[in-house]
Amino acid sequence: MQEDRWSYLWLILGALCLLFSNGKWIVPLAAWLAPLLLIRFLRTQPVGRGLLIAALVHGVIFYVWYVDVIPAGFVPGGLAGFMAFMALMSLIPLGPYAIDRWLSGRLPGFAGTLIFPLSTVALEFANAMLNPMGGWGSLAFTQTDNLPLLQVVSVTGMYGISFLIAWFAGVGNWAWAAGMDWRRVGRGILLYGMVLSLVLLGGGLRLALWSPVMASGRMDGAVERKANRGTAFFPPETATVRVASLSGFDYRYEGEPFTPDDARHIDALFEATVREARAGARIVSWAEASAMIDARDEAALVRRAAEVAKQESIYLQISPYFEPAGERAVNKSILLTPEGEVGWEYWKSRANLLEGTVLGDGNVARADTPYGRLAGAICWDMDFPNYIIQAGRAGADIMLAPSADWRQIDPMHALIARVRAVENGVSLVRHARGGLSAVYDYQGRTLAAVDDFVTTVDRTMVAQVPVHGVRTIYAAVGDLFAWLNVGALALVVGTALRQRRGYVRS
């Protein structure tokens, strides 16, 4: 254990940074500083006391982050089940600190700086794979406005950013413990600085030299689709297509009875669809559950949408939501083609256990069009990187992800989807009922945005969207980077356990 009379000051400062490093209020720099300070606190405290205090701090802050983000009704078991779920989830971000505190003294020198990033990535990966709510809480989601850094997710997935942030904390504490003696720590600091600089430089070059070539004005006709989507995650030159997306004009939650107001609302959506089509939109997308209907009216809704799509020569994605009597609710995305045919019929496929809707078949929707290959998912589906990777592997160019949020996850939920777009080389149209709607290109630039809680008059969103996506290394190799971290951590833990057994025998 290291001695530091300022130990509790680092705890206080670390807790303040932690509060603003995720959840409702994100200050990107705080996400880098919080682990640096909290690791310092833990390494200067007895193991048991330090971890107990850290667990309490994480529990309180996690509750503040997510108390209104996760509706209590989503978790079975009533209030007790909800509190147990919150307590369990708060332990996930604590895990890397506990592993670091256990192993930091067993792996000396610069190699010890890797314990915290390896364990951070391993636990984030496990969370994304096993958590029924998806990969919420990743450090990567705190850095989405840093576009040069964000480009690394096209290679490593979201875990590359998390690794760099956590490694900063590991290197910083190693240098701190050495008294910042440059002769001892200089080469290690330079190595970390070189890695981070190369990531930022590579991302900056990708943004500057291989960005989408934006066509000016609106596109009224088809665009020839190129077979080559680019190589090594560098895009071909591309044109754009005008995409319009529409939200609910009055926000309401699912599960309420169908009313005549819903019928009038659907009429307004069709009127807006025709208006945007005649203004040049070739693709029109409705937000999740925009069409609250009686189960018996689904066929009529689809027929009407098909007629509008054929009449206006557009691709129209509609979002019916209905609750058959005595059955689970149905949450769909249906794409109608300019020929009046159904291009896809997609059921929401993730978080259904919590929402209680009919489970989809587990395949991301896709359709080939003159404007590129479209892919489709719904809202919460975007929180699962191992699911949305299907879009990247299918060579999707534009992804339509109708969504429905609430104030407490605005804008957090949109930021998660932004990372998915860059990971998979797709431009993303995400229109949210009751939250931040945004269009991102495949490098994470914001092409359009509108927030239901800010805009009260017209929530239509229009953008010129690249018709060609780009292949990414992440889509090709999947979570290889995360698995390498898991393997390296297992090797370190195994070595530590063997050393412990040898010490006990002696």
What do the predicted segments below correspond to?
Residues 1-225, 407, 420, 440-443, ...:
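Membrane-embedded alpha-helical bundles of multi-pass enzymes
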Residues 96, 100, 269-274, 364, ...:
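Generic structural signal for well-ordered alpha-helices
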Residues 43, 177, 274-278, 310, ...:
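Residue-level signal for alpha-helix termini/capping positions
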